Amino acid sequence: MQVPNSTGPDNATLQMLRNPAIAVALPVVYSLVAAVSIPGNLFSLWVLCRRMGPRSPSVIFMINLSVTDLMLASVLPFQIYYHCNRHHWVFGVLLCNVVTVAFYANMYSSILTMTCISVERFLGVLYPLSSKRWRRRRYAVAACAGTWLLLLTALSPLARTDLTYPVHALGIITCFDVLKWTMLPSVAMWAVFLFTIFILLFLIPFVITVACYTATILKLLRTEEAHGREQRRRAVGLAAVVLLAFVTCFAPNNFVLLAHIVSRLFYGKSYYHVYKLTLCLSCLNNCLDPFVYYFASREFQLRLREYLGCRRVPRDTLDTRRESLFSARTTSVRSEAGAHPEGMEGATRPGLQRQESVF
């Protein structure tokens, strides 16, 4: 997003709009993301909603993440046409607002949902007994609803503003690439708005996610019991992959955004062309999520193989798998129950066996 001066877009803005790298890279990457993400997440959503067992908090978060990915992918065709058309928006003001809010709301929703998953896994591994009352479906649903309320509130200025801008020097109308100064009353308000988005929707979730996954991995690595070692290795590997994907996809884009905000508002320089290119990394996360679901859940793998006609999966196979995952996950429960006699009783409750995702 570029903020023009009072006389119109400056030379840096015009150069960005003429940049051939952006005109080629974004449509190509967005097309790839849409082609992989839409069928992949549609199938993932079908499996998560119709074919898997009891909906644990992890499954609820994965459903929300899959819906988020689908909504983001559904607006990419408009972005593809816009950039192929030399940044000329032809779909009107209302659709520009809808596409822009949907694009950024769903991108940040992915960040917040992955943060919720990391916290749920952190509590399940490090505090399996004391956190049991909080790791329930209703709290997961409330967390998803809360993230959407936060997002829509934070992005509400975009929904109330005409995000199109006529660039007469190029004979085009942009959508969200150039913003009007009149959108907010002062430079100070621009700074508050942009820094709030960066801190609230990225920096805090980023720190929480990195801290939770790091603590979870270290806890699993310190566990010495041989029972469930394979499941533990799988959980550690997946947590590391999810953390790497989170850092790789979302960190570059948001830190470049921070550099652009500071340089644009206070020094008159722009890194918006770099920011636009790093948006590709954020969108690539949509392609990775279906693979994360596959490796995260043994039941998801079995259902996929059944759907592809590899073999019919007996129900007792899934039940046995849940038993083995439960045994692997309760190593820390056993140690905690040793110190608290009533904890062993809690550890044998069927409610704890609901964990299937190894997020």
UniProtKB/Swiss-Prot annotation:
GO terms under cellular component: plasma membrane
Induction annotation: Down-regulated during granulocytic differentiation.
Keyword Repeat tagged: no
Main location: membrane
Disordered: region residues: 329-359
InterPro entries registered for this protein in UniProt: GPCR_Rhodpsn (IPR000276), GPCR_Rhodpsn_7TM (IPR017452), P2Y8_rcpt (IPR027669)
Keyword Magnesium: no
GO molecular function, one term: G protein-coupled receptor activity
Transmembrane domains' residue ranges: 20-40, 58-78, 89-109, 139-159, 188-208, 238-258, 276-296
Sequence similarity: Belongs to the G-protein coupled receptor 1 family.
Membrane side Cytoplasmic: residue ranges: 41-57, 110-138, 209-237, 297-359
Compartment(s) of residence: Cell membrane
SUPFAM superfamilies cross-referenced by the UniProt entry: Family A G protein-coupled receptor-like (SSF81321)
GO annotation, biological process: G protein-coupled receptor signaling pathway; Rho-activating G protein-coupled receptor signaling pathway
Topology of this chain in the membrane: Multi-pass membrane protein
Tissue expression from the record: Barely detectable in normal blood leukocytes. Weaker expression was seen in heart, kidney and lung. Not detected in brain. Expressed in B cells and follicular helper T cells in germinal centers (at protein level).
Glycosylation sites: N5, N11
Pfam families per record: 7tm_1
Name this polypeptide is given: S-geranylgeranyl-glutathione receptor P2RY8
Protein's job: G protein-coupled receptor for S-geranylgeranyl-glutathione (GGG), an endogenous metabolite present in lymphoid tissues. Couples the binding of GGG to the activation of GNA13 and downstream repression of AKT activation in lymphocytes defining their positioning and growth within lymphoid organs.
Other comment: The gene coding for this protein is located in the pseudoautosomal region 1 (PAR1) of X and Y chromosomes.
Keywords associated with the record: Cell membrane, G-protein coupled receptor, Glycoprotein, Membrane, Receptor, Transducer, Transmembrane, Transmembrane helix
Organism: Homo sapiens
Extracellular side of membrane: 1-19, 79-88, 160-187, 259-275
